[in-house]
UniProtKB/Swiss-Prot annotation:
Biased composition (Basic and acidic residues): 138-150, 195-210, 234-244, 310-364, 423-473, 565-577, 586-595, 612-664
Main location class: nucleus
Key words of the record: Coiled coil, Cytoplasm, DNA damage, DNA recombination, DNA repair, Isopeptide bond, Myogenesis, Nucleus, Phosphoprotein, Ubl conjugation
A cellular component term, taken from the record's GO annotations: nucleus
Domain PWWP: 7-64
Tissue expression: Widely expressed. High expression is found in heart, skeletal muscle, ovary and testis. Overexpression is frequently observed in hepatocellular carcinoma samples.
Function: Acts as an epigenetic regulator of myogenesis in cooperation with DPF3a (isoform 2 of DPF3/BAF45C). Associates with the BAF complex via its interaction with DPF3a and HDGFL2-DPF3a activate myogenic genes by increasing chromatin accessibility through recruitment of SMARCA4/BRG1/BAF190A (ATPase subunit of the BAF complex) to myogenic gene promoters. Promotes the repair of DNA double-strand breaks (DSBs) through the homologous recombination pathway by facilitating the recruitment of the DNA endonuclease RBBP8 to the DSBs.
Renumbered residue ranges of the record's region Disordered: 86-473, 562-671
Similarity field: Belongs to the HDGF family.
This protein's name: Hepatoma-derived growth factor-related protein 2
Organism domain of life: Eukaryota
Length: 671
């Protein structure tokens, strides 16, 4: 059965995360927040904090003194043991009145006081620091198992304690209004005023505990508030994870803007004890307050420090962004400069190449004396142009960067030379004055020549570049040329023959011919072109070449066989024609004999008829011979053409003989 307690009983109170702490059951003041049912208002010695706990977490002091009354490392625990024995009626005392300006004043150093000072103000802080450390450590060591089971109960205990402390403060504030000189609005809103008057000063625990929020001097005794975590509290936080905060009310955030951040030595917030403060010998530890929600209770000073940190971070980010922008701008500038330099170098190289080409052409083209004179004239012009920069206009081919480089390179060499050559120049100054004019006249002539030659070379190069297209393009061009050359209206045989020759020289593959079947079709058609035999022969040659290249030596063998067969056929046809001509000749002779007998002509007439018959035979033989080569190859055609005039010659001799015979017969008749 849990023990029944009365106000004023001394007990050991157990709160999760802390050892059994020396405490006292408090009275419920009029107007104060009533504790929940089955819970007692507890006042913790050493820390002077309050909470609401059930009877199961309370143990009588006298019975459990030997068990739980051992010293502990927790700060505030040993002070609580001393206080429960020597000053069991210790309570919060009203601190002196605090104005709005006092909130800005630095807090008294908690380590400056001693236990001998019994003032109400000094006693509070001392008790807070001492009891907090010792009691918390003892409780943590002894009841770590019970801590795990009572997670939710701790939260419930802290909320009623919060309410009770608020009520106590309200009562104290109402009793001490005259002393504190606080406005009635502050009395009514005790909770808000206590929150607004909390400080941001934090003391760091050298041991495992987080810093405690120190109390501010104010009309209402505030409770210790949990500090907002700072960078320096990382160690204390890490340690306090295992050990829960001491039995204290839940921390509250500073809601009013009237509270200003204090500029104490430590830039961290400290919890506020409820009723009084006492300078502690040790730095204030984080007492019994739990840390369920550290984000909620940032005080005005912590918010200021956070804002300062945010400002620093924002300034750092701005600086980084500015640096990045500067670096990017520099990189862009460097890239642009590099591109410009590369372009300038390319231009210079192009100009140098042009100049070299022009000079080489000029040296090649300029012959004998004229070239020598121009060179002799150019050398002094260059020298003078280097010495006097603005006198002679530079040629169009000279590039500016080259001139600058030459000038800079030869300045140093000319300075010592100028002193030695000045006396030698004086007598021949007139000649030099006359020479520049001649040089200027000769220079444009040379420039024009070089320009013309460069234009000619450029045209030739362009033509060469244009003539370098692929085989397919050449095929298509030649095909179009052949078509245009063999127009019905105005055929151009020479152009067609040239195109066919080029087509025959092309190295054509089967793939190209498969793509361009029109070319093969046109060649087949041109083989039958009757208007000109040369075109026919050339087309046949090109066609056979293409075939031989594409299909290989097999077709050549087949073609040879075909040619041999054709030649045999032609020979047989010739023999048949000759036999027919031989048979026709005796028939004609037989016919001529009866005709002579019947007609009985004169000698001259008979001879003339014989001559005509002979001529007819010869003409028939000539026709037969002409028909033969037509059916034959192109070589036979050439032979027949050559033999044509030879066939006419015997005919003409016979005509002359017949004329001579006719003349002789006429003379005989006259005689």
């Amino acid at each position: 059965m849990p023990h029944a307690f009365k106000p004023g009983d001394l007990v050991f109170a157990k709160m999760k995360g802390y050892p059994h702490w020396p405490a006292r059951i408090d009275d419920i003041a009029d107007g104060a927040v009533k504790p929940p049912p089955n819970k007692y208002p507890i006042f913790f010695f050493g820390t002077h904090e309050t909470a609401f706990l059930g009877p199961k977490d309370l143990f009588p002091y006298d019975k459990c003194k030997d068990k739980y009354g051992k010293p502990n490392k927790r700060k505030g625990f040993n002070e609580g043991l001393w206080e429960i024995q020597n000053n069991p009626h210790a309570s919060y005392s009203a601190p002196p009145p605090v104005s709005s300006s006092d909130s800005e004043a630095p807090e008294a150093n908690p380590a400056d006081g001693s236990d001998a000072d019994e003032d109400d103000e000094d006693r509070g802080v001392m008790a807070v620091t001492a009891v907090t450390a010792t009691a918390a450590s003892d409780r943590m060591e002894s009841d770590s198992d019970s801590d795990k089971s009572s997670d939710n109960s701790g939260l419930k205990r802290k909320t009623p304690a919060l309410k009770m402390s608020v009520s106590k403060r309200a009562r104290k504030a109402s009793s001490d209004l005259d002393q504190a000189s606080v406005s009635p609005s502050e009395e009514e809103n005790s909770e808000s005023s206590s929150e607004s008057e909390k400080t941001s000063d934090q003391d760091f625990t050298p041991e495992k505990k987080a810093a405690v929020r120190a109390p501010r001097r104010g009309p209402l005794g505030g409770r210790k508030k949990k500090k907002a975590p700072s960078a320096s509290d990382s160690d204390s936080k890490a340690d306090s994870d295992g050990a829960k905060p001491e039995p204290v009310a839940m921390a509250r955030s500073a809601s009013s803007s009237s509270s200003s951040s204090s500029s104490s030595d430590s830039d961290v917030s400290v919890k506020k004890p409820p009723r009084g403060r006492k300078p502690a010998e040790k730095p204030l530890p984080k007492p019994r307050g739990r840390k369920p929600k550290p984000e909620r209770p940032p005080s005005s000073s912590s918010s200021d420090s956070d804002s300062d940190e945010v400002d620093r971070i924002s300034e750092w980010k701005r600086r980084d962004e500015a640096r990045r922008r500067e670096l990017e701008a520099r990189r862009r500038r460097e890239q642009e400069e590099e591109l410009r330099r590369l372009r300038e170098q390319e231009k210079e190289e192009k100009e140098r190449r042009r100049e070299r080409a022009d000079r080489g052409e000029a040296e090649r083209g300029s012959g004998g004396s004229s070239g020598d004179e121009l060179r002799e004239d150019d050398e002094p012009v260059k020298k003078r142009g280097r010495k006097g920069r603005g006198r002679g206009p530079p040629s169009s081919s000279d590039s500016e960067p080259e001139a600058e480089l030459e000038r800079e390179a030869k300045k140093s060499a000319k300075k010592p030379q100028s002193s030695s050559t000045e006396p030698a120049r004086k007598p021949g100054q007139k000649e030099k004055r006359v020479r520049p004019e001649e040089k200027q006249q000769a220079k444009p002539v040379k420039v024009e020549r070089t320009r013309k030659r460069s234009e000619g070379f450029s045209m030739d190069r362009k033509v060469e570049k244009k003539k370098e297209p692929s085989v397919e393009e050449k095929l298509q061009k030649l095909h179009s040329e052949i078509k245009f050359a063999l127009k019905v209206d105005s055929p151009d045989v020479k152009r067609c023959l040239n195109a066919l020759e080029e087509l025959g020289t092309l190295q054509v593959t089967s793939q190209i011919l498969q793509k361009n079947t029109d070319v093969v079709a046109t060649l087949k058609k041109i083989r039958r072109y009757k208007a000109n035999k040369d075109v026919m022969e050339k087309a046949a040659e090109v066609y056979t070449r293409l075939k031989s290249r594409v299909l290989g030596p097999k077709i050549e063998a087949v073609q040879k066989v075909n040619k041999a067969g054709m030649e045999k056929e032609k020979a047989e046809e010739k023999l048949a024609g000759e036999e027919l001509a031989g048979e026709e000749a005796p028939q004609e002779k037989a016919e001529d004999k009866p005709s002579t007998d019947l007609s009985a002509p004169v000698n001259g007439e008979a001879t003339s008829q014989k001559g005509e018959s002979a001529e007819d035979k010869e003409h028939e033989e000539g026709r037969d011979s002409e028909e033969g080569p037509r059916c034959g190859s192109s070589e036979d055609l050439h032979d027949s053409v050559r033999e044509g005039p030879d066939l006419d010659r015997p005919g003409s001799d016979r005509q002359e003989r017949e004329r001579a015979r006719g003349d002789s017969e006429a003379l005989d008749e006259e005689s």
